């Protein structure tokens, strides 16, 4: 018997997804493999995902795999590599605390005295709809069904039907929905899940319905006893697939509380299973209040992915009496506003207007090409692994795909994908891209990405081993099939080809020969294809850096794989905790290497990108811009922030920063340089058209201040509109800012304003301002920075003096539009 000892690396513990992947890895071997959690003193068959989940394994638990059988030596090598390198990738990422923190109630809402219930924010957003209570269905009718001779047959039929339904949904869904459906499919295909139902029927003589329910209760009891929140929240998944089995087996016993949403609805339930959520008409799902759902439940993950706000912590009995009433679920502030009056509804209408403006502005910004502050162009692209990720990447502002990991098509399957399957996958992403470039990295398999059906022997050091372009000659037919598929797809869009792990010119010359052979074959076969294709290499082996000039004669572009390049340059395994602190690309040697690559390539008219993790690190963006890189490719959620930051950077200043960094003697000196580097920011004018509004239909003072502060947030003049609003209200409490003549001048000197601003709203009708000076038709709000000195007094004084002038006031009230108001104020006032 051989043993692998390790500490569990999974932050969320051994839940469904990693348990399924570990089970799949272990199931490849004939040997018996036992998983042991030493903290729990729990053992499990490693070829059963449910058994693995039942061990209650948490992050950093001491664990081992015991392997015994004819292929134990090979199994140990493969599984040890998997545990050390890829096991952690099977975990899911928990939302950050910042996403889940309720904001204090803004004064513009609290002053309206709304009827509120307070909960915990699980998914942010605001939803308006009718409160609808969903009662849980009783399973007693299924439990009471007597045993039958046909039960075993019915179980097999129901399992097969459910698997077929899940597979059909998998074909129709993408993103988080697909991931969660895959987890459910893995659970029903687990031998222990169905095996325990069979044992309950044969050994305890239970009927099929009772056996399904008993199995559900047993598994849920194990999960509920776990110390891990994440594992406890998998109870909903077990209940979900068990209830689906019951409904398939006895369709005549329809659920009493089937959900049909015919109007905007705030759904209130003890819990909601993922399949129930997926069955809803999301157009009418305004929000959810789930009493028992935790922060990592699959239903909540789906809700976040669908932008559905969710609260918890509100007992059902506290809400039941409000069923059927209108409400607002505010998952920004963590409140439920019951039966809102006109004023409260008005607050949320203003909030929605601001949200719509923000969304429109973000979409417009994401769609813009990436430029530096001084108009230096740089491409911002996305790293993706499947065609399904492409639309989301482009929505985030990706100008192309800098790395399409084609090896994902080859993994987790029993045989390689054929040419047609690959062609369809590549064609799909090209059609989604339009004329945007898609860089297909040819299969980076072997080494640390073992593919069982290739039968490549295991290696002591897979990172330095037989992988990527090094295996292509042995598997020339496999490689040729991929080239044919990419060339066929390339006729439908802007496809480019990138070869990984190249270290010599001979390799790329061989690849070019294979491309020509593939083109000849496609012509012979009469298949539509591209006659030529742009060709590049991944620069991740240091030897390439010294012959970039030679490669420039053979390829069109270079993309630096910073992850592997860092490891190879320093001889550091970043997964080895003893040396991983040495893994740092921001050192003089690494930066000088990048500088050499870029300089040599540019001298010969070739472009250079970077597609490792470094490309999306906002802290190092000034260095990457300064080094002259032409493209940065990153995970798509990072793209909007990187584009926004890039617009604030001056390329000349960044070039000087990069020059100084290359002269540093240590990483610490470079970090100090970065800390001291303060990009010059555009000075935004005090008065601007974006902050002037006419004919605004506000009902009260609260809406006016809410809108003007919120608009400053939309326009990037503050990152903290709620805090800025609070400062305005604190000043308002000292003395009312109504100054007479139908004018109010709310003002504050605040740390929360990034660019001092004057905001103006001329109203469609007068509103009360709680002032002896009467109603207000014109609001002029001053928000000045805390470091403005006495400037706010000067501005306020100028305005006050001008407003005494009847002609000036009449001109303000008579101005036809916002531009006319701006022109008048710029003429009359000096700042």
Curated annotation (Swiss-Prot):
**Which residue intervals make up region (PTS EI)?**
119-650
Encoding gene (name): fryA
Cross-referenced PANTHER family: MULTIPHOSPHORYL TRANSFER PROTEIN 1-RELATED, PHOSPHOENOLPYRUVATE-PROTEIN PHOSPHOTRANSFERASE
EC number(s) stated in the UniProt entry for this protein: 2.7.3.9, 2.7.1.202
Localization of this protein = Cytoplasm
Domain remark from Swiss-Prot or TrEMBL: The PTS EIIA type-2 domain is phosphorylated by phospho-HPr on a histidyl residue. Then, it transfers the phosphoryl group to the PTS EIIB type-2 domain.
List of residues that carry Phosphohistidine: 15, 298, 747
Please state every residue range assigned to the domain named HPr.
1-90
Q: Which residues bind phosphoenolpyruvate?
A: 405, 441, 563-564, 574
Q: Biological process GO annotation list?
A: N-acetylglucosamine transport; phosphoenolpyruvate-dependent sugar phosphotransferase system
Q: Which GO terms describe its cellular component?
A: cytoplasm; membrane
Reaction equation(s) it catalyzes:
L-histidyl-[protein] + phosphoenolpyruvate = N(pros)-phospho-L-histidyl-[protein] + pyruvate; D-fructose(out) + N(pros)-phospho-L-histidyl-[protein] = D-fructose 1-phosphate(in) + L-histidyl-[protein]
Keywords of this protein's UniProt record, alphabetized?
A: Cytoplasm, Kinase, Magnesium, Metal-binding, Phosphoprotein, Phosphotransferase system, Sugar transport, Transferase, Transport
- Family listed: Belongs to the PEP-utilizing enzyme family.
Q: Which organism is it from?
A: Escherichia coli (strain K12)
Query: Which coarse location class applies to the principal site listed for this UniProt protein?
Result: cytoplasm
Residue ranges annotated for the PTS EIIA type-2 domain, each copy included: 685-828
Function, as annotated, reads:
Multifunctional protein that includes general (non sugar-specific) and sugar-specific components of the phosphoenolpyruvate-dependent sugar phosphotransferase system (sugar PTS). This major carbohydrate active transport system catalyzes the phosphorylation of incoming sugar substrates concomitantly with their translocation across the cell membrane. The enzyme II FryABC PTS system is involved in fructose transport.
Tell me the cofactors it needs: Mg(2+)
Molecular function GO labels: kinase activity; metal ion binding; phosphoenolpyruvate-protein phosphotransferase activity; protein-N(PI)-phosphohistidine-sugar phosphotransferase activity
Cite the active-site annotation: 15, 298, 611, 747
Name of the featured protein: Multiphosphoryl transfer protein 1
Positions with a binding annotation for Mg(2+):
540, 564
């Amino acid at each position: 018997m051989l043993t692998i000892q390790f500490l569990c690396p999974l932050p969320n513990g051994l839940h469904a997804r990693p348990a399924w992947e570990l089970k799949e890895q272990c199931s490849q071997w004939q040997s018996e493999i036992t998983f042991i959690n030493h903290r729990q003193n729990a053992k499990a068959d490693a070829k059963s995902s449910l058994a693995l989940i039942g061990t209650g394994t948490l992050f950093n638990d001491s664990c081992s795999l015991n392997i015994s059988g004819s292929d134990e030596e090979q199994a140990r090598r493969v599984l040890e590599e998997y545990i050390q390198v890829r096991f952690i990738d099977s975990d899911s990422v928990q939302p950050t605390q910042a996403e889940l923190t309720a904001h204090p109630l803004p004064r513009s809402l609290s002053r309206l005295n709304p009827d509120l219930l307070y909960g915990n924010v699980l998914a942010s957003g605001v939803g308006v709809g009718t409160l609808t209570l969903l009662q849980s269905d009783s399973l007693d009718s299924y439990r009471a069904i007597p045993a039958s001779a046909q039960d075993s047959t019915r179980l097999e039929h129901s399992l097969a039907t459910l698997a077929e339904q899940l597979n059909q949904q998998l074909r129709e869904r993408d993103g988080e929905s697909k991931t969660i459906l895959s987890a459910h499919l893995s659970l029903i295909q687990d031998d222990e899940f169905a095996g325990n139902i069979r044992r309950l029927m044969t050994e305890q003589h239970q009927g099929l319905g009772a056996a399904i329910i008993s199995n559900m209760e047993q598994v849920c009891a194990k999960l509920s006893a776990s110390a891990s929140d994440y594992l406890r929240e998998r109870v909903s998944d077990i209940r979900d697939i068990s209830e689906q089995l019951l409904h398939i087996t006895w369709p005549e016993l329809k659920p009493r509380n089937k959900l049909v949403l015919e109007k905007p609805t705030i759904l209130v339930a003890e819990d909601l299973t993922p399949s129930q959520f997926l069955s809803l008409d999301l157009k009418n799902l305004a929000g959810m209040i789930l009493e028992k759902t935790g922060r990592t439940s699959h239903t909540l993950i789906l809700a976040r992915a669908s932008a559905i706000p969710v609260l918890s912590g509100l007992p059902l009995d506290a809400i039941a009496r409000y069923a059927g009433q209108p409400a607002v679920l505010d998952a920004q502030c963590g409140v439920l506003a019951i039966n809102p009056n006109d004023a409260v509804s008005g607050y949320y209408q203003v909030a929605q207007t601001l949200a719509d403006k923000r969304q429109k502005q973000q979409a417009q910004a994401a769609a813009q090409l990436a430029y530096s502050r001084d108009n230096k162009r740089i491409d911002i692209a996305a790293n993706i692994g499947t065609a399904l990720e492409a639309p989301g990447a482009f929505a985030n502002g990706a100008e192309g795909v800098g790395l399409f990991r084609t090896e994902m098509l080859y993994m987790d399957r029993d045989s390689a994908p054929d040419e047609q399957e690959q062609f369809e996958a590549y064609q799909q992403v090209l059609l989604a891209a339009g004329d945007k470039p898609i860089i297909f990295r040819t299969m980076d398999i072997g080494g640390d990405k073992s593919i069982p059906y290739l039968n490549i022997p295991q290696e002591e050091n897979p990172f330095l081993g037989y992988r990527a372009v090094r295996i292509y000659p042995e598997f020339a037919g496999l490689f040729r099939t991929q080239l044919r598929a990419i060339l066929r797809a390339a006729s439908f869009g802007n496809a480019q080809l990138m070869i990984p792990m190249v270290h010599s010119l001979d390799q790329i010359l061989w690849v070019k020969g294979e491309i020509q052979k593939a083109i000849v074959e496609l012509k012979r076969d009469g298949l539509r294809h591209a006659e030529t294709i742009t060709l590049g290499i991944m620069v991740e082996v240091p030897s390439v850096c010294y012959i970039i000039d030679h490669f420039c004669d053979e390829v069109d572009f270079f993309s630096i794989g910073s992850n592997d390049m860092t490891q190879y340059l320093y001889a550091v395994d970043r997964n080895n905790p003893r040396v991983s602190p040495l893994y740092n690309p921001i050192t003089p040697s690494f930066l000088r290497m990048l500088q050499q690559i870029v300089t040599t390539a540019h001298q010969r008219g070739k472009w250079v990108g970077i597609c490792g993790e470094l490309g999306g690190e906002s802290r190092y963006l000034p260095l990457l811009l300064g080094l002259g890189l032409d493209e940065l490719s990153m995970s798509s959620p990072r793209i909007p922030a990187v584009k926004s930051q890039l617009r604030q950077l001056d390329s000349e200043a960044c070039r000087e920063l990069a020059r100084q960094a290359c002269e540093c003697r240590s990483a610490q000196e470079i970090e100090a340089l970065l800390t001291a580097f303060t990009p010059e920011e555009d000075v935004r004018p005090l008065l601007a058209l974006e902050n002037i509004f006419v004919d605004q239909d506000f009902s009260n003072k609260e809406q006016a201040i809410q809108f003007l502060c919120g608009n400053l947030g939309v326009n990037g003049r503050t990152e903290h509109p709620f805090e800025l609003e609070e400062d305005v209200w604190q000043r308002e409490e000292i003395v009312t800012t109504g100054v007479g003549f139908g004018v109010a001048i709310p003002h504050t000197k605040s740390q929360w304003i990034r660019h001092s601003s004057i905001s103006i709203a001329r109203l469609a009708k007068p509103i009360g301002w709680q002032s002896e000076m009467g109603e207000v038709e014109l609001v002029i709000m001053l928000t000045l920075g805390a470091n403005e000195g006495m400037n706010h007094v000067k501005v306020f004084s100028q305005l006050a003096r001008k407003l005494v002038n009847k002609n000036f006031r009449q001109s303000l009230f008579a101005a036809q539009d916002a531009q006319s108001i701006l022109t008048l104020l710029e003429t009359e006032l000096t700042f």
